[in-house]
Amino acid sequence: MSGNKVEVDKRRTFAIISHPDAGKTTITEKVLLFGNALQKAGTVKGKKSGQHAKSDWMEMEKDRGISITTSVMQFPYHDALVNLLDTPGHEDFSEDTYRTLTAVDSCLMVIDSAKGVEQRTIKLMEVTRLRDTPIVTFMNKLDRDIRDPIELMDEVEEVLNIKCAPITWPIGCGKEFKGVYHLLRDEVILYQGGMGHTIQDSRVIKGLDNPELDDAIGSYAADIRDEMELVVGASHEFDLELFLKGELTPVYFGTALGNFGVDHILDGIVEWAPIPQPRETETRDVQPEEEKFSGFVFKIQANMDPKHRDRVAFMRVCSGRYEQGMKMHHVRLGKDVNVSDALTFMAGDRNRAEAAYPGDIIGLHNHGTIRIGDTFTQGEKLRFTGVPNFAPEMFRRIRLRDPLKQKQLLKGLVQLSEEGAVQVFRPLDSNDLIVGAVGVLQFEVVVGRLKTEYKVEAIYEAISVATARWVYCNDHKKLDEFKRKCSMNLALDGGDNLTYIAPTMVNLNLSMERYPDIEFAKTREN
């Protein structure tokens, strides 16, 4: 077995997806605790000890207790090496999340057991469906009062159209939460409160009929025996093949805040989740075992280190091996670059990467030449597909308090648009700068980051824009005519792509009827 194959087989690369406040960042903390990456977990809110969550490292995230950017963390667990991508839970940061889902091989879906399936989870699941990504489910917050577990699983099956196979089952909930029964191991794992910041040494009782169980949890023992007969009859058995096709999800119950059940999920991910998978390019599928290096950029993050005003491109390694000092071919630019300072991440902590294998995420220092979706190889002209840009749903005009800082404003906005935090449009017929986002909070983030990172005081104001579409046409004459007649509605985005800015949906529909040879696209491949 080649060294590369051994390394590929060790890797598990997954993202955590959920509705805001379902407990995703808390789970990330506890996962890192089990991976020995943290000595003591910090929880997101109520930080009496000043312990901020390790994965929420930007200033604004620390202030608000929400994850805004995608954090990347690598840690060992048993014999595997886990790459965990923590995605923004807040609904306004969906674009970053969508793109992150293109860089993983499986996902952990976190559900608030008191609320069930929520809107954001539905949308994220639609994105995972595009690639049939395998999903592991964690029903969180068992230390609170929850909905009926069978009802929760029925809802997941009905709303998300995926079969559920319970792996663990809760015994009680809220103040009466006693633990879980592990169906595959035939054992009860007892819950102990007040152990949220450390790893629990849980008591395990083998077998449901064990008299020790009655001594430990009293009348709950008879309840769980009766309940399990019903559950086994009413639910699906775990089937690895269906899981790998994205048709069935193993379901775990627990409490991330109480640090209970998280190790059960990790055990499942390491045992069942796929190793790094082949990746599609425009010309062929790239296999992870191939000798030559290849990878694609799915995210750019500016100013990860405020002291150095830097920008880092996050790259998923798809094949071969990254070695310090190696020469890479930047396909879009047709240039070779020597890379000696790629990074690996433990949230805000960065280390120089000596080697990286398929499934790993490395950071490349970016001086404005790397864009989201760029492919790097060892010479072959490949282009990985499926890293999309989405048309924004909300628009604002950005204005300066100090008109002399126009240059810094444009620079800041273009850099922020290149990292995918926001999209910027420069109308052909005016000096306005229009910013497009998927949610309102993004505008606040942009103004905040312009101030702290670029020393630019800007304000945003309402503008009559309903939507934007990228414009394409193979016939240059027809495109020129369209540009001439519709110039007042045309703009260039941060990458100088022609975009139609529609004041109303009626206007867009009329233009589409009037110019049938012009393509008005909702998404753009990076």
UniProtKB/Swiss-Prot annotation:
Secreted among keywords: no
The organism's taxonomic lineage, starting at the top: Bacteria, Pseudomonadati, Pseudomonadota, Gammaproteobacteria, Alteromonadales
Compartments it resides in: Cytoplasm
GO annotation terms (biological process): regulation of translational termination
Keyword check for Protein biosynthesis: yes
Organism of origin: Shewanella halifaxensis (strain HAW-EB4)
InterPro entries: EF-G-like_DII, EFG_III/V, G_TR_CS, P-loop_NTPase, PrfC, RF3_C, RF3_dom_3_sf, RF3_GTP-bd
SUPFAM superfamilies with a match to the protein in the record: EF-G C-terminal domain-like, P-loop containing nucleoside triphosphate hydrolases, Translation proteins
GO molecular function annotation: GTP binding; GTPase activity; guanosine tetraphosphate binding; translation release factor activity, codon nonspecific; translation release factor activity, codon specific
Family listed: Belongs to the TRAFAC class translation factor GTPase superfamily. Classic translation factor GTPase family. PrfC subfamily.
HAMAP family found in the cross-reference section: Rel_fac_3
GO cellular component: cytosol
Role of this protein: Increases the formation of ribosomal termination complexes and stimulates activities of RF-1 and RF-2. It binds guanine nucleotides and has strong preference for UGA stop codons. It may interact directly with the ribosome. The stimulation of RF-1 and RF-2 is significantly reduced by GTP and GDP, but not by GMP.
Binding-site positions, GTP: 18-25, 86-90, 140-143
Keywords attached to this entry: Cytoplasm, GTP-binding, Nucleotide-binding, Protein biosynthesis
Name of the protein described by the UniProt record: Peptide chain release factor 3
Ranges of residues in domain tr-type G: 9-277
